[in-house]
């Protein structure tokens, strides 16, 4: 056996038990220049890889997946745009400095767009650059030092729950600085679909951002964003159950924090995909020629590059085609079309095809009924002016708006959506376009209006419960909307302020004075106001304008338009209602007790005739009548009734003269 092999340390994977993470080992003998060659032919690329012996030979296949076999081993091999690579490298490089502006780098984008790959390759360059060994001496060989500490969601530490393991991971990661410097990578997130787990995850991220420690290792979070198709996906709902993105996982406080840097990734363009797929075909030239597929490689590569922007899916599809014995149809991984992507295709068209009808048909087939929803037409209305930076005639804009209006009038017909989208695409296709700048895509403001309406209804129900159970007053929803929704909380707020200074005044009165009781009686209405019960803020929130926002920013967790915030309002309404019902029942019970006390005291104190001399026989009398009165009445009843003389009621002449 060669002596060099005996002295060579085996490549093993270590895991820090206190962190619950997987440590990936990297080789230090790698080029460090991030600059990529402008162009290179297939033969030049092949000879370069053969001379450097970076990639394994095709003879030791052994059934290995190609996306693992041909994964990048240096920064130059990563499929990423030069400008995006520069942005990530500059942001990550600045995070290693002592007084770094950012503590967390958030990379978000679709699957297979080289998010985590570029971070791992950059760590090979930046971690050794900034790592400080104690006393300038390295006690371990450089190739085996950990450059990336990655959180593993399936790794349980000391039988702790998942979030406790994640918390312990972050606590231990704080010490990976100076001579132990390592880049912290979080790609495998905890179960953020569970609301309590998601909130705990957000709290831990905020603790990292607000930490008072002057020196922390760089923390990189990679989020693979996607649309989650559901049969009951309703356009009126938005949340992590339907859209897995940074906006639904994080909250607004995290995403807007000054110590967090976010970089959005796009799907890999067809040029980069073709370059890497060609290189893989060259590496497997022998096998492709044996299967008589070498001459068809370019056609297959072009098809795969147009169908997907996921490099892992593209490589897997190429491997399936190359290793199959027969000529099977090529199909890439099913990719959902996002809301903004579909809007961009309708307004700006598609680069993959010039046939607009075919493009619209593909959208209807692959969009999971997204194009049939009302929000999509509103998105077209909100963003049609972004075409060519708004430089088109007013007649074209009028025809687009008229088309969408006609589509609304035919809303009951299934063909209405197709008519509207095809007419819009036809109008834009006939407009001369300058350049390829599509501008920013905005989310329709109608979504905010609907969410604010739902929030207003919940708050109105809450105020109505207080008015009914506490003040015994009932109001219609119309009156709440027009009058009470604004003025009633304002009055209660003023009364609450008056109650505070009245209590302060009573507190400072001298003891023994009669002022407190008189003041409490005089201002009894004001003293009824309770901050935990009464609504003192305007129903629906403060009055403000609705502005358009790009992306999914208006739908974040702690935004007033989000469904999670609406659920919190419902919980607050139910909590207040339970308190009101309990208080109302206590008041009713107290009133019933007082009424029973009055009835009991009345029965114990009967009415006595003070004129009666025989007070001892009062119990034998009936309604104040004695036995003698009874006998007298019996005697009188046996006598014949007397006849009174008839008196003429008419007046004589003399009587009239006297009058």
Curated annotation (Swiss-Prot):
| Key words of the record | ATP-binding, Cell cycle, DNA damage, Nucleotide-binding, Nucleus, Phosphoprotein
Q: What positions does the entry give for ATP binding?
A: 109-116
The record's section on InterPro entries has: Checkpoint_prot_Rad17_Rad24, P-loop_NTPase, Rad17/Rad24_fun/met, RFC_lid
Any Pfam family matching the protein:
Rad17
Entry superkingdom: Eukaryota
**One of the protein's GO biological processes:** DNA damage checkpoint signaling
Q: Does the keyword Protease apply?
A: no
Where in or outside the cell it occurs: the entry states: Nucleus
Which coarse location class describes where this protein primarily resides?
A: nucleus
Give the span(s) annotated as Disordered. 24-54, 596-659
> Per its record, what are the GO molecular function terms?
ATP binding; chromatin binding; DNA clamp loader activity
- Residues annotated as coiled-coil are none
Q: Give Gene Ontology CC terms.
A: nucleus; Rad17 RFC-like complex
Q: Which Gene3D superfamilies match?
A: P-loop containing nucleotide triphosphate hydrolases
Upon changing residue 115 to E, the result is:
Reduces NTP-binding and hydrolysis. Shows DNA damage sensitivity
Which CDD domains does this chain map to?
Answer: HLD_clamp_RFC
**Function, in words:** Participates in checkpoint pathways arrest of the cell cycle, a mechanism that allows the DNA repair pathways to act to restore the integrity of the DNA prior to DNA synthesis or separation of the replicated chromosomes. Regulates the DNA damage checkpoint pathway throughout the cell cycle, when associated with RCF5. Component of the RFC-like RAD24-RFC complex which loads the checkpoint clamp DDC1:MEC3:RAD17 complex and is involved in DNA repair pathways.
State the NCBIfam families in the record: rad24
What extra comment accompanies this record? Present with 752 molecules/cell in log phase SD medium.
Quaternary state and partners of this protein?
Component of the RAD24-RFC complex which consists of RAD14, RFC2, RFC3, RFC4 and RFC5 and associates with the checkpoint clamp DDC1:MEC3:RAD17 complex. RAD24 interacts with ECO1.
Among PANTHER family, the record links this protein to: CELL CYCLE CHECKPOINT PROTEIN RAD17
The protein's name: Checkpoint protein RAD24
Question: In which organism is this protein found?
Answer: Saccharomyces cerevisiae (strain ATCC 204508 / S288c)
